Amino acid sequence: MTSLYGRHAEKTTDMPKPSAPKVHVQRSVSRDTIAIHFSASGEEEEEEEEEFREYFEEGLDDQSIVTGLEAKEDLYLEPQVGHDPAGPAASPVLADGLSVSQAPAILPVSKNTVKLLESPVPAAQVLSTVPLAVSPGSSSSGPLASSPSVSSLSEQKTSSSSPLSSPSKSPILSSSASTSTLSSAKPFMSLVKSLSTEVEPKESPHPARHRHLMKTLVKSLSTDTSRQESDTVSYKPPDSKLNLHLFKQFTQPRNTGGDSKTAPSSPLTSPSDTRSFFKVPEMEAKIEDTKRRLSEVIYEPFQLLSKIIGEESGSHRPKALSSSASELSNLSSLNGHLESNNNYSIKEEECDSEGDGYGSDSNIPRSDHPKSTGEPTREIELKSSQGSSLKDLGLKTSSLVLEKCSLSALVSKEDEEFCELYTEDFDLETEGESKVDKLSDIPLKPEVLAEDGVVLDSEDEVDSAVQHPELPVKTLGFFIMCVYVYLILPLPHYVSGLFLGIGLGFMTAVCVIWFFTPPSAHKYHKLHKNLRHWNTRSLDIKEPEILKGWMNEIYNYDPETYHATLTHSVFVRLEGGTLRLSKPNKNISRRASYNEPKPEVTYISQKIYDLSDSKIYLVPKTLARKRIWNKKYPICIELGQQDDFMSKAQTDKETSEEKPPAEGSEDPKKPPRPQEGTRSSQRDQILYLFGRTGREKEEWFRRFILASKLKSEIKKSSGVSGGKPGLLPAHSRHNSPSGHLTHSRSSSKGSVEEIMSQPKQKELAGSVRQKMLLDYSVYMGRCVPQESRSPQRSPLQSAESSPTAGKKLPEVPPSEEEEQEAWVNALLGRIFWDFLGEKYWSDLVSKKIQMKLSKIKLPYFMNELTLTELDMGVAVPKILQAFKPYVDHQGLWIDLEMSYNGSFLMTLETKMNLTKLGKEPLVEALKVGEIGKEGCRPRAFCLADSDEESSSAGSSEEDDAPEPSGGDKQLLPGAEGYVGGHRTSKIMRFVDKITKSKYFQKATETEFIKKKIEEVSNTPLLLTVEVQECRGTLAVNIPPPPTDRVWYGFRKPPHVELKARPKLGEREVTLVHVTDWIEKKLEQEFQKVFVMPNMDDVYITIMHSAMDPRSTSCLLKDPPVEAADQP
């Protein structure tokens, strides 16, 4: 192939960027001719137009031409050149004005002509017409097919002569890839003439002229399109029609190596076509750009529909769509009426690099929507953004291909029926669609869960059993076989009559029963059967065979002389009925604390006792209900006969050495053991053991009682065949010969059968009590959700807590979790409304707090703490989340996520009485504190059976250092006393030593010092404490029966925001170190009471404990020795 200008390729690199092209369409009054003004964007293009001006004039008829501005539109082109994967032969060479998206159109020759005039506008003005339909088998760019009615002029010379219509070529528009061998001006005259068309009569008004002109264009387009599919050779269409062919534009993605705007598809049907080709000069580029400008000018009033179709056709821009589709859609709308012929259709074909093509069907009903037949994989990304807009429009077409579209359907559409969509709209629609899909999936979840086999609770199981009874398949089969044999076999008449009578009688009986039986009778039997099976299902709770832990022991207990420093630490192991007490070489802390380290001790001795027939009770005898589980009062164990047991223990010791507990090392206790055994053989041996926390004390007491009844229950069960174990204060248990304590709840069998098989008790109340205790695990099994779930349901449980749960599994929204506890928070909030607002309750709380404050031990020169101000805030604690309850050997556990933001505020006041300095501290201590043997404690016994507050739970009387002799206790603010050999703390001894010196006494006698001491003594010390926030996991525990306590404490130290503002008189102390120290100490005191293993307790009136006088087995009705025999 040749070109007119050989150095065109070199010029293109130096050419300036084309300016924004403009279009001016002029039409004569006679409407026979149309004048379109265009020019190149540079000087070279103007010279080129002057060169061909003479050919324009020759081709014009004598018809008059009237210049009229028809339309104008600015378009800013964005030329983009991609990488050419095909090689250098297809490298992109762009000329000025060449950044267009269409190829030259094949237009028929018409009798009328159109005159092209030079426009004075310097901007590039390009003519655009409806382009040619893409060849189905060609790639997206390549040489353009020419016909006798198509011509073009070229400005580029190239050595390449072979056509580039092969599908393997890169889809890039180059100057050499779209040229022909024609270099004369005659073909260009045919192109100019083909722009002419026959129009309707001139008398039609201006809007009508638009519609008639477009109608003719649409008709000629549809007719010629159908012919073009069957005829691949050049032809001369009728002069009365303007034959237009559609072709695909903007379908190439920008990553295919070509410009999405400048890469038209080749219309060649075969690379072996020998017809003449034409070159692509800059003039052709201007013409192509002008064609597109004209199409956009025409469809501007209907730009919304064009954007929708263009986006559907695979463009990356909302406005980018093929000129053929956009022009035709707007032309159809301009017609203003429905086309009666449904044969008119438009076809927009997609031709990818593999040459995939789509056919068209001209017989499409107007009501049918286009359907997609395929979708290339390279446009998957576009599909997601286009799918939502297509669904909203009711179109089910491919994101790349508008395969079939009825012309009449497009014409019937009004412009208000279409909405303006942009790229961001598609994203929003996609999100909205996903939400709709999620909402549509919600009703399906219950069905899916039901099909997957949800584990139903007892009521659901009963309903399912009633609604879905099992079919008696075998019975029905046998009955059908009998009927078949009866009808087939030649039976005698009397046999047939017998069978017939039996059958009729059976059916009559069934009908009578069905009519006269109440409808709920069958359902009742089903419910009874299911409930019976449900009741016998018990919890699988296994108690540890060995209960071990630290306790405090005292040899002799006297409430009037007792002090915590008189106790020593022991490690206790309870295995069956055997109790082992291991004494360490040094004491550990007398009270448990959160996250305490493992003590490093060595055991120096060990005592072994048999608790069989022992008497277990609490001392003092008359403990107030609120002090039953106070750790300051011990558990008393009056041991039974120990002679046989100790001889057996010695034999076991000789055969196998006794290992020390896990917390210690090997203990050298073998030599003194015979002496200890002799001592323990005495019947009057009594042990006093203190729990380190109140909750541990209750647990130890319950287990001691069970161990004391272990052997007696074995004897009873072995002596009486089928006999039942005696009453236990907790739950039923069966014993093993080894003496290990085994819980009956560990068996999967229920206790209902055992109750039915037991002989009747003499006392009805006792049997009722027995049955209640036996059914404890069964009763709790109905109250606590089952641990086991079906495999289909188990992932759902983990979805609430695990972030890695599968997305397809239904998840509980956070709002639902909050709603589950909303009713509890609302109920508590309403109940405590008056509690927060009424003065009666604030005074009651103030009194309770004051009773606690009065028991705090302060230095002897300080007055008592008083509560001067209390503000309980405006809110009560809220439950943020309630975890699933569970039951273990310690009872029922419920974990609650709590939060408090109520601004609880209280102000404490005290004074320092410096006049007491230098006086005998023992005398002052006798008035306030509890000191030990030397001092008499007349109130100690009185406090035991009263509801008056005892010493603070956070008091330091039990907080001494882990020394062998129980050394000096740690000093805490406001907690001074005599401990560890009845010695005061080091600081107090140092202060006493200074104040008793003669120099200090002389100094205090001076008037100035006396005056200052009086001023300081009269100055109040104020401390305002505000609890702003408290948040943590609160554990609520209810021990197994019999108990009347509910224990609560935080699993770990909660997040507490305390603000302490100390004042010295009217002056507020603002030292950061002082306030931080006070806040830290307050948090430590809070942990000593409310952080596990320390738990606070409240007693519930409706619950009964072993010490409850209302109980049939109350231990307080009789003296302690006899009370131990009662369960």
Curated annotation (Swiss-Prot):
Glycosylation sites noted in the Swiss-Prot or TrEMBL record: N330
Listed InterPro entries: SMP_LBD
A cellular component term, taken from the record's GO annotations: nuclear membrane
Subcellular compartments: Endoplasmic reticulum membrane; Nucleus membrane
Keyword Transmembrane: yes
Coiled-coil residue spans: none
Residues that span the membrane, as ranges: 475-495, 497-517
Domain of life, source organism: Eukaryota
Residues recorded with modification Phosphoserine: S196, S265, S266, S270, S295, S732, S738, S744, S748, S751, S798, S815
Topology versus the membrane: Multi-pass membrane protein
Keywords: Endoplasmic reticulum, Glycoprotein, Lipid transport, Lipid-binding, Membrane, Nucleus, Phosphoprotein, Transmembrane, Transmembrane helix, Transport
Biased composition (Low complexity): 133-187
Modification sites for Phosphothreonine: T262
Compositional bias per record (Basic and acidic residues), positions renumbered to this chain: 366-382, 650-670
Molecular function as annotated in GO: lipid binding
Record-level GO BP terms: lipid transport; signal transduction; sphingolipid metabolic process
SMP-LTD domain location: 816-1101
Biased composition range(s): Acidic residues: 947-962
Biased composition (Polar residues): 249-275, 735-750, 787-804
Region (Disordered): 1-27, 133-279, 348-386, 648-685, 715-764, 786-816, 947-980
Entry function: During endoplasmic reticulum (ER) stress or when cellular ceramide levels increase, may induce contacts between the ER and medial-Golgi complex to facilitate non-vesicular transport of ceramides from the ER to the Golgi complex where they are converted to complex sphingolipids, preventing toxic ceramide accumulation.
Domain comment quoted from the record: The SMP-LTD domain is a barrel-like domain that can bind various types of glycerophospholipids in its interior and mediate their transfer between two adjacent bilayers.
Protein name stated in the entry: Testis-expressed protein 2
Source species of the chain: Homo sapiens (Human)
UniProt lineage: Eukaryota, Metazoa, Chordata, Craniata, Vertebrata
